[in-house]
């Protein structure tokens, strides 16, 4: 006994139909959608039978306007890669049906504005950032085939989409000023992860890749295109900044070494022409070589003599206001203009070579009063080398106070 593939009952009729290599009752061969009897031809999918219209409506090419299937007998319009019913291919402003070859402006890939309405209503064009296209136009006019420099130039006309747009609406309103932008699009975290992964693989994706991203993320293809443009621009700026930082780091990390002032200066060797000469090299008309500790009783020539007024570092009085000694007793053999040498003797000693009082020196010792230099030992003795050569000339009264200024 033969059973029907549709109702699973035995076939007792005189006639039967053989569909998909199975036996059917005549009344069981019908469309699963509209329930019409199929006599001449039928279409099947997943074991179900469909009539021609229902099959193309369910599984055929979808209209980009109404999202319904397109029958093979229907007339269609094509714009870029989209297919539309004639009734769906109309202007969204005036509902006029657009004809083949007519210039139009596309919004969100599935809405159209005719040229007349676009030109007459410029505010709509500014708000929605419309881009012109021609029905059935050559693929060279599509954004995919344009030069990369033009892609970056279109950023100023399109909606600015970035991964920080969620919290930057207030700042954007201030920065835009008088210029109006298109509607803002907020990209969620999951969508952003998908876009970043796609950018890491291909920084400039093709239209096919963008269509796949649009299906995965649910975003508009124009939004995805603008996001990739902004991302490429950001990457270029980051590369420029990193290159500038690398040059600056190399400049400060390895500066040129300065050449030494004196080439190949041996240890212990002195700089012969330095700004400060050594004690043994110092010569003048008063001090000869090695004569830094000599005292000249006759004093300098009267034309170059100095007075205490010319010596700014010698105090004119002590803490109590008492003048430092008397100047009315000239030394024997001194010229009257050499009172500065009689008042003080400037000696230059290197550190650690300060003279100490030694009773074996034949020259007299000069005491320094404690009233002049504050709390110090009651009397500090200063001895001068070469005292034997001038000891006979120092015969001034003992109450005179002389101090060696170091």
From Swiss-Prot:
Taxonomically, the superkingdom here is Eukaryota
Q: Which GO terms describe its biological process?
A: anatomical structure formation involved in morphogenesis; anatomical structure morphogenesis; animal organ morphogenesis; anterior/posterior axis specification; anterior/posterior pattern specification; branching involved in ureteric bud morphogenesis; cell-cell signaling; cellular response to fibroblast growth factor stimulus
| Compositionally biased region (Low complexity) | 137-148, 315-327
Going by the UniProt record, its keywords in alphabetical order are:
Developmental protein, Differentiation, DNA-binding, Homeobox, LIM domain, Metal-binding, Neurogenesis, Nucleus, Phosphoprotein, Repeat, Transcription, Transcription regulation, Zinc
Tissues and organs where the protein is expressed, per its UniProt entry: Expressed in the brain, thymus, and tonsils. Expressed in samples from patients with chronic myeloid leukemia (CML) and in 58% of acute myeloid leukemia (AML) cell lines.
Annotated region (Disordered), positions in chain? 128-187, 293-374
Q: Which GO MF terms does the UniProt record name?
A: cis-regulatory region sequence-specific DNA binding; DNA-binding transcription factor activity; DNA-binding transcription factor activity, RNA polymerase II-specific; RNA polymerase II transcription regulatory region sequence-specific DNA binding; sequence-specific double-stranded DNA binding; zinc ion binding
Sites bearing Phosphoserine, chain numbering: 162
| Every LIM zinc-binding domain range | 4-54, 63-117
Query: Its GO CC terms?
Result: chromatin; nucleus; protein-containing complex; transcription regulator complex
UniProt biased composition (Basic and acidic residues): 151-167
Where composition is biased (Pro residues), the residues are 352-362
Q: Known PROSITE patterns for this protein? A: HOMEOBOX_1, HOMEOBOX_2, LIM_DOMAIN_1, LIM_DOMAIN_2
Where is the DNA-binding region? 180-239
Q: Which SUPFAM superfamilies match?
A: Glucocorticoid receptor-like (DNA-binding domain), Homeodomain-like
Q: Assembly and partners?
A: Interacts with LDB1 via the tandem LIM domains.
Functional summary from the UniProt entry: Potential transcription factor. May play a role in early mesoderm formation and later in lateral mesoderm differentiation and neurogenesis.
- What name does UniProt use for this protein? LIM/homeobox protein Lhx1
Which organism is the protein's source? Homo sapiens (Human)
Q: What is the lineage of its organism?
A: Eukaryota, Metazoa, Chordata, Craniata, Vertebrata
């Amino acid at each position: 006994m033969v059973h029907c593939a549709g109702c699973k009952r035995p076939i007792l009729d005189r006639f039967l139909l053989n569909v998909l290599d199975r036996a059917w009752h005549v009344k069981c061969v019908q469309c699963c959608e509209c329930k019409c009897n199929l006599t001449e031809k039928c279409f099947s999918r997943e074991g179900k039978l469909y009539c021609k219209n229902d099959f193309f409506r369910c599984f055929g090419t979808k209209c980009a306007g109404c999202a319904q299937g397109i029958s093979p007998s229907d007339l269609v319009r094509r714009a870029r890669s989209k297919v539309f019913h004639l009734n769906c291919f109309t202007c969204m402003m005036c509902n006029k049906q657009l004809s083949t070859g007519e210039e139009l402006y596309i919004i969100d890939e599935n809405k159209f504005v005719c040229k007349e309405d676009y030109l007459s209503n410029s505010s709509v064009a500014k708000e929605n950032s419309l881009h012109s296209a021609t029905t059935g136009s050559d693929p060279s006019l599509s954004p995919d085939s344009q030069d990369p420099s033009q892609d970056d130039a279109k950023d100023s006309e399109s909606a600015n989409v970035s991964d920080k747009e969620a919290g930057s609406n207030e700042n954007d309103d201030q920065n835009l000023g008088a210029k109006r932008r298109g509607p803002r699009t907020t990209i969620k975290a999951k969508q952003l992860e998908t876009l970043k992964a796609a950018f890491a693989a291909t920084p400039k994706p093709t239209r096919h890749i963008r269509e796949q991203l649009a299906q995965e993320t649910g975003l508009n293809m124009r939004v995805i295109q603008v996001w990739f443009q902004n991302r490429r621009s950001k990457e270029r700026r980051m590369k420029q900044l990193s290159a500038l930082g690398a040059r600056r780091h190399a400049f400060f990390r390895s500066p040129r070494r300065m050449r030494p002032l004196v080439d190949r200066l041996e240890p212990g060797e002195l700089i012969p022409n330095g700004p400060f000469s050594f004690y043994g090299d110092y010569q003048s008309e008063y001090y000869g070589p090695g004569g830094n500790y000599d005292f000249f009783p006759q004093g300098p020539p009267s034309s170059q003599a100095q007075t205490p007024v010319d010596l700014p570092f010698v105090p004119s009085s002590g803490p109590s206001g008492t003048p430092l000694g008397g100047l009315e007793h000239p030394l024997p053999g001194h010229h009257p203009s050499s009172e500065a040498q009689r008042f003080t003797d400037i000696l230059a000693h290197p550190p650690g070579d300060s003279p100490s009082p030694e009773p074996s020196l034949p020259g007299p010792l000069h005491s320094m009063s404690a009233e002049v230099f504050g709390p110090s030992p009651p009397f500090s003795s200063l001895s001068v080398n070469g005292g034997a050569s001038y000891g006979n000339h120092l015969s001034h009264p003992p109450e005179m106070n002389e101090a060696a200024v170091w």
